[in-house]
Amino acid sequence: MNSLEQVKGLIKEEIQAAVLKAELATEEQIPNVVLESPKDKTNGDFSTNMAMQLARVAKKAPRMIAEELVANFDKAKASIEKIEIAGPGFINFYMDNSYLTDLIPTIVNAGEAYGETSTGKGEKVQVEFVSANPTGDLHLGHARGAAVGDTLCNLLAKAGYDVSREYYINDAGNQIHNLALSVEARYMQALGLEKEMPEDGYHGADIIAIGKRLAEEFGDRYAKADEKESYEFYREYGLKYELAKLQKDLESFRVKFDVWFSETSLYKNGKIDQALAVLKERDEIFEEDGATWFRSMTYGDDKNRVLIKNDGSYTYLTPDIAYHRDKLERGFDKLINIWGADHHGYIPRMKAAIQALGYDKETLEVEIIQMVQLYQNGEKMKMSKRTGKAVTLRELMEEVGVDAMRYFFAMRSGDSHLDFDMDLAVSKSNENPVYYAQYAHARVCSILRQGEELGLATGGDVNYKLVTSEKEVELLKKLGEFPAVVADAAQKRLPHRITNYAFELAAALHSFYNAEKVLNQDNLELSKARYELMKAVRTTLQNALAIVGVSAPEKM
């Protein structure tokens, strides 16, 4: 449990104790204590409507109940300085600032661990994201999915979940067949032989490059080889090349996966046959018109789904069912899939499949990522000015940098459309949210360097109770919120809450800096306390930015 959560827990305990002391209700009758943080801080740090909740049981007016609760509340036990009653009976609690100052050494001593919580209780969570076809470059939708997915994984890990990151390689479908034929055509052309590109082939420069490389390395060896042997070679070589490129781009984007899972392995290991056998045994499939159907309507889907077509081939759904069964067999408590908006209609049938296999459909969670629209010079940017094609992850990294991309992609809820202003992303102004947060960190580091010059880094006793000004208290309260923000954002799968928090903490720091002379040679005792406060800000801001995958520069 973290420090601010401890205070909330103590307040709840004291409210319950006050109810019993005032004989307003029995222990069984006490409703769940709800504590909220008022947006207007003049209404306190926490507020409860307990008096209104007790009105029916106590048979008294809420205002009278509130007065009795306040009279029986032990402020000292809950680190509360004062309590006020507002309106019809809201009770507002104001924290004791001396408690807040104890946060400073707590944060500094915790270091990178500050913000960690036990919310997840070690629950095993698998997050599958990106999973783009290995047939070309990653586009902006993939980039946003990568940023949101990786931030969510970092967030879940910080909150005490056991997280596994997974990339599903679609290497068994028709797109890989077309990749192999495209590689073959470019290889033949590089040898000076006539070979038309397949109708649904891949015309990118990377496929031309593969063809030239093959011609240089192998000459005409595969032009003369057995057709089956050469096809397998083109397929494997093209797949290996494209995957290596994807992995390199993702690593440059600071995204690493624990597992790269091959769709082909589901066929080789008999996983598809096993999944179909389970569905058949549970009477979840039937034959009709020469095809095999899944009774997905039983589980809320709008129609039953074909698993095996009348020509004997599988639909896309069949290996997906086998894949999700494999995930569940690996012992994960939760499966989180991050999909593009075009997959929204796919959710009911996947949940139906999981239920039909005998698992709880709520085990699967799907986070939808909406499209990204680039803007430059105030205009929509539909195509890359350099290539005339869709802008890729790699190209945008070169244009605006990884930090800006990671922050911008993660700062809105994934299910909302994102307008990405390229000019804003590279601007050195307070309007640029990533610059604003990073500049706050650099500013803190500058203050700490000044503190070292004043001899404030030598250790010794620190009088934290001197940190009492209005702006200092606001900053301390914001620092204290971080673990609760992590816990709540992780539970609700809302990674953008972390960028919101980083912005708010940066704003509190800038506000304090503009209002106070942080370090004063004429008052070294206060300066020492503020020096430690700045260390706590640096730690917390670093930890927040680390969740988002953004660097925390010491100088800017």
UniProtKB/Swiss-Prot annotation:
Placement of sequence motif 'HIGH' region: 132-142
GO cellular component: cytoplasm
Keyword tRNA-binding: no
First-tier enzyme category under EC: ligase
Pfam families assigned to the protein according to its UniProt record, in alphabetical order: Arg_tRNA_synt_N, DALR_1, tRNA-synt_1d
One Gene Ontology term of the molecular function aspect: ATP binding
Compartments, as annotated in UniProt: Cytoplasm
PROSITE patterns reported in the protein's UniProt record: AA_TRNA_LIGASE_I (PS00178)
A GO biological process held by the record: arginyl-tRNA aminoacylation
Keywords, sorted A to Z: Aminoacyl-tRNA synthetase, ATP-binding, Cytoplasm, Ligase, Nucleotide-binding, Protein biosynthesis
Entry EC number(s): 6.1.1.19
Catalyses which reaction(s): tRNA(Arg) + L-arginine + ATP = L-arginyl-tRNA(Arg) + AMP + diphosphate
SUPFAM superfamilies, per the entry: Anticodon-binding domain of a subclass of class I aminoacyl-tRNA synthetases, Arginyl-tRNA synthetase (ArgRS), N-terminal 'additional' domain, Nucleotidylyl transferase
Keyword Aminoacyl-tRNA synthetase: yes
NCBIfam families: argS
Subunit structure: Monomer.
Family indicated by similarity: Belongs to the class-I aminoacyl-tRNA synthetase family.
UniProt-recorded name of the protein: Arginine--tRNA ligase
Upper taxonomic lineage: Bacteria, Bacillati, Bacillota, Bacilli, Bacillales
